Amino acid sequence: MTVLQPPSSVCYPLNLPIVPNPNLDEATRKKLTLECRTGAAVELARSGVFVHGGLTLPLNLTIINSLQLQKELILYFGKQKDRNADFKTLADWISPEIFFLDLISRTWQRINTTIDTTSENELNNGLSFKERLFHSMCFTESNIYIFGGLMVSPHNGYELIATNELWKLDLKTKCWSLISENPQITRRFNHSMHVLNENNENQDTKLIIVGGLDNMDIPVKKIDIFNLRTSLWESESKSDENPASKGSSKILVNIDGMPISLSHDSNFSVLIENNQAEIPTLALYYPQREANTSRRGTDDGSFSTYAHDLDDKSKLPKHHHHHHGDLKYFESDDADENAVKTLMSPIVILPLLGNSQGARMTSNPTQNNKENSILQVPFHLQYPSGNYFNYNIVVIGFYPDPQPSNLHCFIYNIASGKWIRVNIACTECSISMHRFWKLLIWKSHHQALLLGTRTDDFCSPSVQKFDHILSFSLPMLNGYNKLVNTKHTRTNNGIANSHNLNVNLSLYDHLPYSNSSTIEHTNPYTVTQGYSLDDSGIPRLTSTATSQFENYSRYITVPLEMESTSSIFPPYAMVLGKDALEIFGKTLSDFEFITADGDSIGVPVYLLRKRWGRYFDSLLSNGYANTSFNYEFNGDTSNIISFSPHTASKTTKFGNSSQSSNGSLEKYFSKNGNSKSNSNTSLKKPHSVDFTSSTSSPKQRAISHNKLSPSEPILCADEEDSRSNTLKQHATGDTGLKETGTSNKRPISTTCSSTGMVFRVPFQDMKNSKLGLSEQSGRSTRASSVSPPPVYKKSTNDGNDSNCTLSNTPLVYRRASTVGTTTNSSVDDGFSSIRRASHPLQSYIIAKSSPSSISKASPAEKAFSRRKSSALRFIASPNQSRQTSFASTASTASVVSSTSGRRRNSNQISHLGSSASLPNSPILPVLNIPLPPQEKIPLEPLPPVPKAPSRRSSSLAEYVQFGRDSPVASRRSSHSTRKSSSSDARRISNSSLLRNTLDSQLLSNSYGSDIPYEASIQEYGMNNGRDEEEDGDNQDYGCISPSNIRPIFSTINAININGNFKEGEFFSSKSYINNEKSRRLSYISNPESVESTNSNNNAIIELEPLLTPRSLYMPWSTASVRAFAEFFYTAQINGKWLLAPVTLDLLIMAKIYEIPILYELITEVLYKIISKKEEGLSVTCEALLNLFQQKVSRYCNENEGKIRKQLDSSESYQDTLEIKRSLANIDNGYVDSYLLRNTSMAQSIHYTDDSNGETEIDMHHTGISSIGSLANRAVPTVFAGGPRDSHNSIGSIAFPSNSGVQNIRRSVSLFSPATKKKSSLSRETDPLDTSDQFTDDVPDSGPVSRQQNFPRRSSSFTETVPTEPTRYNYQNLDSSKSNRASDDKEEQNEQATLQDISNFDKYKVETLQKRNSNDGKDLDRTNDPLKNRGTEIPQNSSNLETDPFIRDSFDSDSGSSFRSDSDDLDSQLGILPFTKMNKKLQEQTSQEFDDSIDPLYKIGSSTPGSSRLHGSFSKYIRPNSQREDGSEYVNISSLENMVSPNALPPVDYVMKSIYRTSVLVNDSNLMTRTKEAIELSKVLKKLKKKVLQDISQMDDEMRETGKPIFARGSSSPTLSRQHSDVATPLKQQENTRPALKFASSSPISEGFRKSSIKFSQAPSTQISPRTSVTDFTASQQRRQHMNKRFSTQTTHSTSALFMNPAFMPSAVNTGRKESEGHCEDRSATANRTNRKEDATTNDNDNIAPFPFFGKRR
């Protein structure tokens, strides 16, 4: 039984457009909604989906042609008698509307469009854009293009005719224009259209039109090409210009010269531009079928059999066809007896060259066996839909019939020709419940989307519905074996660069292989490799500054060498990010991460809020809420802010004064304050979405749209104008201020009286709040105006798009004004443009009426007015630099100031310091400076809540602002990740949330009323405008509960569902995370974070900068946190990052902290590592099988019968074949069922043993705390509430371990960790004695305890003959369930012991250090567990070693676990302890298990302090370490070295680390793949030993008979060494410590030894680690010494050695013999296989590996 690998898919409902008028007739209503379509055109562009046209009737079409369509229409209306009377023309039932789906909010919108009548194009005169169906649509450069389709005949309203019109919709103007109606172009429908050279600025953008039918239902075989720049049809113009070459430029859809037909319903085509040939190529899905087999079981007379008849008549030259069922093979004419019957693929490649011939691709040789049923489905898909993603074609289709349950998804890897099955089952419901009909690729988010309907409506896929979507992740594309058979390896024959139009392209010459080591093709923004060539192919000789910068960009932002990894941003954006990080990082930073090592890493808040998103906002809001709560309830005092009700009572004089934080950086780039802010700045991307104009429901969206035009989304670039059209205009009552214009605010500087430092409230614009500079210089300014939080409105004549504010708080609108100004006071507009974005501005105080208010000021005011504010100087002198103050170092991107046009305006966020100082506040925190009195409390009634258009109503503006040549014209950031639907969880108004908080009290008291909770629901729109009916329809997807409310800045205290306030209760981030995950479009953080908190349009009080958090403690190493911060700058995976701990840490951080794009990018890398492991296992299997076959052939004297009999009877050979089949199954997308069954059984036994084994474990005094529950076992240190003071503990988030606060603090964990049982380490006396007791007790503890404590290395290599020879060792796995259980038990014990060790106090650590240093010699001589292990080996294989952790912890070579403060990080959150890894590698090195270079530790394993190298990688960036040496550490274990094409497969403990990390992030697919690789590696090690033993036995027999042992051409010395090693007694190693040196039996290890022998055998490296712990300087010296050797010799020599293709077979094969976590075969026989593979694989074409990687140019 085959089981698919776990799915990564999630389903989401979509909000369909709302009917603008319920009284519309049925035909019109269906046009204006998306209930159903037939023949609509669908296209995904950036982060949205467009749908246009189509019949509004559900027609189940088995065949799509005009005749069949009209028949179905007649039948449909014949059944609908009530519609016959209303039927006038078919045009009534064809929609002309275009709809847009925002993938972020998952909401459909209808776009109101018009016909461009002002165009100079004569084609538009008198024309109307008619309804159509079965047309094609594409998107490029802010335009939508539509070609062809069926229209209603102008002469007959009942007839449909094809058209050849090409229309363009300009999304800027939303106007349709006809750009071509060339009669020479064939009319067609049911075709496809692609955009060529969209991202290549050096080539003209062209439209490629493929397939379809003409007016007579005859297939159109010609490909038409339209040049968008010249507006000419190239497919016709060239032949017209040159009659002699007429027809020469035509491109026909063909296979080997035989024309074929393509129809959109039966085939699909994708355009591949980034191939090695640099020739755009179409990949067509065109399956082969027998002539008598109709497409869908229909009559043979259908048109769809036409193409297959052609194909069956075509004769493939030079190949003979064979049939197996419906699958076709061809056999080469080569006389090679080993020629493989190759299955022909349904994928056809067709280069876009004149008269080029298409070629059908072949399938991967590993999938050619006729028993392989996986190929039956993708070769016979019905209603196929496909798309292209990074050298893979993702395909969905139905087989054997179009039932929803028969929908299959496959991935076709172009490089290897392999088909991989993908599980797309919905995790929340059965797949049969959903019906999907269309596949889309969301490239920016690495997601595949399936569009359809939630419930099965029993319609065929021709019926299109749009209410449900399924997404699944695409990083798994890296996780499959892509080895290509050497027979099909491409040759660099120059055809790719030849422009000979008549060349017949061979099958593999134009495969879209990855191109060069720079992998520029992986970046969707980079142009093709010919970007420096013009159309003539001549390199450009000119070099401009732009081209130089582009070259520099590509040089500095080289992605990882992975064929399926794409960058998020274009290179220039990443360069800007890198420069900002490395050059201006400190200058820009106003926030810092505090790492577990105590280091500080600066980063701008603006950047974090933009690209981290709502999770960071929640952290900020919680931190701000905690601070304000402490000020309010605990009376905490501060030097900056003091609580003085007396002072506050004097502040009423300037009650109208306001503070707002309208910190849009775009204002700086506005040419003047009144100009529209459409600036093309890199800070505001053209495709950025303004979340400030948002509502949370389609109801509000419809309301707001109707004010402009019915159901019309706002596509204008000025996204704020839409808000100004919908905001209700409110007067301000007794303020006496008339709203005559826009009142955009300038910030108010907050100045500390003691130091004069300017605490900058985020700056704003001052529109009508103008005050002349000369006048203002004579007026007093004040640091902080204390007033009720203002609410502003934006008038319709305001041009600035970043300053409109929405509010739902019970406040009135007030205009901003400066001190002593009236409504006509002004300040020079130039300030808004000359001021730097980072400059603090002078504080402006709003006077009530006239300048005379200054003269009436209180004495405090007058005293203060005599002081000139330093902020004034910033206005007067635009060249003034930033002040070195607390506030100025916190840049404009403060918590509230970092806003842009696409996020909320900060004047919605009030500063707590001011709001808390309102009258009637119980405690009034005010600045410790003289403050004026406050205004009287206004008594006017509260205005109604203004409503505004949807948050994403302007999202289409991201498509329309800039052309291709704009530097910001790239698609929106993939960090613009998904947020939960705006209608899901934002139904509780913020005003109700704030009811009992300090701010809400102030607000209610200010206006003399306290609004009841229920009233707030009704009056202030808790349901956000959703009516009862709508709520009822969507109750499945969202409910009103506090857990559904995202934490917001103003959320100071939590409320329960009844609105009751619980003192000290805050929103739980954990529940917030868990509840949000269910409805997001993939556990995604929304970088437009503030928008997500503001999408409910409720008021958000301004933040007080003095209370704003400015640092965040992150319990991770400095290296990990630095990489974490770097990602926000560059949005790229840095190849220099270490796999452990950095990358694995980042995976967990991305999951916990909700950064999904980071998660996707890291999983891509991890899948690539897994695939390299599986490739290595496959190569090892092939090598073993071929080696065994050669030996058997010699042994049987080439007698075929004897050879077959011998192979069939060889158990080891058959078992190896089983492993090969298992690897093939895994690579095809299935789970190995036998491994799965054994693993699940072992796990269940393990859980049963947990509670019972506790006493027994403690009996041995191992110091392992009892863990009795599955939850604690599955969740390691960090989440199980481990030692509070350890670096890894979540509880240490608030206090670094060196803060001295250990026992008195309470945990501030976001996850509320469970209480941990007391560690048994508290009663430990001496770890050395414990080790001795443990080893002494082992023989008497019985077999059960042996199994529990020694399973990890209970390999069978010590046995001469396996005690349990079993087929595939599966029975052995079954019989070793207790061993398997104890494997996991041991891992659990390691984690628990690491927790407890980290809980040691300094006294015990110092005692242990002293004792260990005193007992060093004795320990080396007598107490070495390694020696004890050696003496026990012959007695019992399970006693191969003592408990790994005990040995690692207490052995003299790794005793630093107790003595190094950095070793608390050794386990790194689920990763294997690095001391243990180091020990295993030392053994591996000494016994030479394999020739592979361990990517993590082989280099440093000879250095006793190597655990510091990686286990505590952050050591190198501790303040007292040499930071310059950091780059020298990361070479071997860096990602670029682990995933490069020539990298060696990872050793098993690397897989183990990935597996443990995948458990932490609960990634079932990643867990399954890694666990399978680990288990198969273990089994393969045992089988390798058995195979080599069988070979050795055959060699002995052959010696006795005098036969030659080695076949001609084999490397007999190497093989003989391997064979002799099998019988080598292990006693040679029993009494010797594993020397830290390389054995000299392998050429690879020899070469490596030469490069590293200087430090591997240096005397200093033999110093005991105990001395290095007590003397840190010595350790530093050793590391520096190693670094010098490492950087100068090792990297170069090993790179040169292993990049040599001659070494690749053996290098690959060695990757499976690595030291591994639970069952290592540390046999010296392992290297035999390496040498045999050296001898055999080089001579055997069938297994020569890596042609895909090795043939890179």
UniProtKB/Swiss-Prot annotation:
Q: Where is this region: Disordered?
A: 651-753, 771-807, 875-915, 938-957, 962-988, 1312-1467, 1604-1686, 1706-1753
Keywords of the record, alphabetical order, are: Cytoplasm, Kelch repeat, Meiosis, Phosphoprotein, Repeat, Sporulation
Do you know which Gene3D superfamilies this protein is assigned to? Kelch-type beta propeller
Q: Indicate whether Transcription regulation appears among the record's keywords.
A: no
Compositional bias (Basic and acidic residues): 1399-1430, 1711-1723
Q: Which residues carry this modification: Phosphoserine?
A: S838, S1289, S1307, S1356, S1664
Q: Which GO terms describe its cellular component?
A: cytoplasm; cytosol
Q: Where does the record place the modification Phosphothreonine?
A: T298
Please name the GO terms that the record assigns under molecular function.
Answer: peroxidase activity
- In terms of superkingdom, the source organism counts as Eukaryota
Query: What are the Pro residues biased-composition ranges?
Result: 938-947
Polar residues: bias regions: 651-664, 690-699, 740-753, 774-783, 797-807, 1344-1379, 1653-1677
Q: Where in the cell is it found?
A: Cytoplasm
Q: Where is the composition biased (Low complexity)?
A: 670-683, 880-900, 979-988
Q: Which GO terms describe its biological process?
A: ascospore formation; cell redox homeostasis
State the InterPro entries in the record.
Beta-prop_ATRN-MKLN-like, Kelch-typ_b-propeller
The UniProt entry lists the main location of this chain as cytoplasm
Kelch repeats span which residues? 143-198, 206-253
Q: What else is known?
A: Present with 815 molecules/cell in log phase SD medium.
Q: Tell me, what does this protein do in biology?
A: Negatively regulates early sporulation-specific genes. Seems to exert its function by positively regulating the Ras/cAMP pathway. Required for growth under alkaline conditions. Acts synergetically with MDS3.
This chain's protein is named: Negative regulator of sporulation PMD1
Q: Which gene encodes it?
A: PMD1
